């Protein structure tokens, strides 16, 4: 367990949720404690600032929580990566597998991103890396963002599930505040 910011007391572990064999990391206590949430957002913003981003991408749904705060603090645009059929305009889509199923992410085609951008992809947790890699590939393939100009940032990393390694192997950068091993 790596937790240099002392946020562990605000993360609950729930066994066998959403299916047997999965240990869910529940961040609601962190969100309900203003000082802990402020610390998390501040530290994630500090990690982001050194990357010099031009946009922040929030992954549905818990990634939205942190991405909005980070984008606001960095004065950068916030782009939403949503589940299928949640966006009103034509969208690019990328299917991927989760540790307990499969789905897709979508970003609107009219989003103002280009090959000149440096983006941060924000989510609450990295498990197998499927969600983050799908989002990063969507940005690279459809908006021309160079892989080395994409940073995947999460509150929590579960390195034993291989997600961070998968992100790095895809040519993307990765960082997190906490790691549960």
Indicate residue ranges for each PLM-predicted region:
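Active-site-facing substrate-recognition patch
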Residues: 1-53, 108-110
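PRPP-dependent phosphoribosyltransferase catalytic core
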Residues: 9, 134-181
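Short glycine-rich phosphate-binding loop at a beta-alpha junction
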Residues: 52-60, 150
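Generic enzyme active-site microenvironment
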Residues: 58, 121-122
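Short Gly/Thr/Asp-enriched flexible loops that form oxyanion-binding sites at enzyme active sites
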Residues: 65-74, 136
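Short, glycine/charge-rich flexible loops or terminal/linker lids adjacent to PRPP-binding catalytic cores
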Residues: 76-120
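Acidic, divalent-metal-coordinating active-site segment for phosphoryl/phosphodiester hydrolysis
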Residues: 123-133
């Amino acid at each position: 367990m790596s937790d240099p910011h002392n946020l562990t007391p605000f993360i609950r572990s729930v066994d066998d949720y959403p299916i047997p064999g999965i240990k869910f990391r529940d961040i609601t206590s962190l969100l309900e404690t203003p000082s802990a949430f402020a610390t998390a957002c501040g530290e994630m913003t500090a990690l982001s600032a050194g990357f010099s981003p031009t946009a922040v991408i929030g992954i549905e749904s818990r990634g939205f929580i942190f991405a909005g705060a980070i984008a606001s603090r960095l004065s950068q645009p916030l782009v939403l990566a949503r589940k299928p059929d949640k966006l009103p305009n034509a969208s690019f889509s990328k299917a991927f597998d989760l540790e307990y199923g499969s789905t897709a992410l979508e970003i609107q085609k009219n989003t103002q991103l280009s090959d000149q951008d440096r983006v941060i992809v924000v989510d609450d947790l990295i498990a197998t890396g499927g969600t983050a890699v799908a989002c990063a590939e969507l940005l690279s393939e459809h908006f021309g963002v160079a892989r080395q100009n994409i940073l995947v940032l999460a509150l929590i990393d579960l390195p034993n599930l291989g997600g961070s390694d998968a992100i790095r192997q895809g040519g993307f950068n990765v960082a997190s505040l906490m790691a549960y091993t």
